[in-house]
Amino acid sequence: MKRDLHQFQGPNHGTSIAGSSTSSPAVFGKDKMMMVKEEEDDELLGVLGYKVRSSEMAEVALKLEQLETMMGNAQEDGLAHLATDTVHYNPAELYSWLDNMLTELNPPAATTGSNALNPEINNNNNNNSFFTGGDLKAIPGNAVCRRSNQFAFAVDSSSNKRLKPSSSPDSMVTSPSPAGVIGTTVTTVTESTRPLILVDSQDNGVRLVHALMACAEAVQSSNLTLAEALVKQIGFLAVSQAGAMRKVATYFAEALARRIYRLSPPQTQIDHSLSDTLQMHFYETCPYLKFAHFTANQAILEAFEGKKRVHVIDFSMNQGLQWPALMQALALREGGPPSFRLTGIGPPAADNSDHLHEVGCKLAQLAEAIHVEFEYRGFVANSLADLDASMLELRPSETEAVAVNSVFELHKLLGRTGGIEKVFGVVKQIKPVIFTVVEQESNHNGPVFLDRFTESLHYYSTLFDSLEGAPSSQDKVMSEVYLGKQICNLVACEGPDRVERHETLSQWSNRFGSSGFAPAHLGSNAFKQASTLLALFNGGEGYRVEENNGCLMLSWHTRPLITTSAWKLSAVH
């Protein structure tokens, strides 16, 4: 809103306080700041792929006003060719795109002169205060529709149009109507189809990826001003996408924003409890956790062959979803089931309840029903690095065979100095017949933020793409939230707070080898049965099981996503 003139006048009401010389230092400094701001805006527009300068935005806004007015007043016949014959592929070149659109429309009422349709705009063409940043839209149109491989931006010609007033308070912009009605609003009464301006979806997708990468690069170089501007544009560009791309971009945008504004996600007991619940939904939606449990159980079952007393120490107890299948397999074992002891380790509950005990009670009921001798004990630990072998009530290996199991847990130790070495030391004291490990197949633990960001963007884009084939349900939505929390931790956090430090099989193999473990190859039965399991999900389409040096990898198309490996103490130990 304009201030009254007397607010800027001195006591004599005739001399301006700040207006005696245009070459004063204050004015010069203001001009310099404006030039720097324009350069920053030009940089941002260039990064996003728009071939236009900030100084040209006023004229672009003028053309957008003309285009909106023409489309609002054109008849159905005058726009039909846009919906059928004309496709505009590159709105990044705003000048040529707008000129092309204005030429294609060519309304019958148009006269010579670029602003003949709206003479009020001509009268105020040099008044840049008429145009503000809020008047501009990166992509024109009021609605977004998905059509094959393109995005269709629809303009509803049957809706009411309100044209902006000029800078003069007494002049109103009007549009001619068949009834000759003059006023601030014009209502189109003709019924028409929605004419479409089609934009290549790949163009928008590429621009979105470029914006994500540019923002991550700005964060790494500590250019937070540019990063802040880019993260806002990422959210805007993401809504023009559909499916997995929109969801992934939204989660990465949130994570980048948290890093920029130093709003680290919480790492509390409530957060642990929520992650546990979300993991259950993830288990129901897609085959990744089922594959992890099945392949690990198969390796444990083979290692327990012929043993009368067996003991599993689970580093990732959670809701105990892995163990009913193993207990049923033991119950069906030739010669009768062995005595089965289970030690479950998990984080503390938010309400201080003994949730591990509740899980044990449910498993005990199952064991009784299938006639398996069962013993259970749960341990609460904030970190696996807090464990000590003496807590586990180990029995002589001659009387009891022990297996250690870890699913998506070991990578959380890599941010704690000496954490993984401490756990490996405890496992060697346990002397298990097998140590089964499931981890994400990706390197998200490098020292360079931009490299981690790039790898995680590829990895989670593939994961979200695999979820698109699942039926829409609450489980699917919660599964996406589960993955989104991982993205947030990976991108927004550093130091001990960043626990999502995934590494590849080759990296883990080096760690295990240097710590005194040797690989225990998974059998062919696990490979065949895992392939059968995947057929239950989307007909198995897209999922692949691959064998890699005795380990099993679950891939979506050609990208490995998780790996199951098994280890035993090397001969020298």
Swiss-Prot record:
GO cellular component: nucleus
GO MF terms, alphabetically ordered: DNA-binding transcription factor activity; sequence-specific DNA binding
Residue span of motif LXXLL motif: 410-414
Transmembrane segments: none
Chain residue ranges for the region called Leucine repeat I (LRI): 206-260
Polar residues bias: start-end ranges: 9-25
Entry's localization field: Nucleus
Protein name, entry field: DELLA protein RGA1
Gene: RGA1
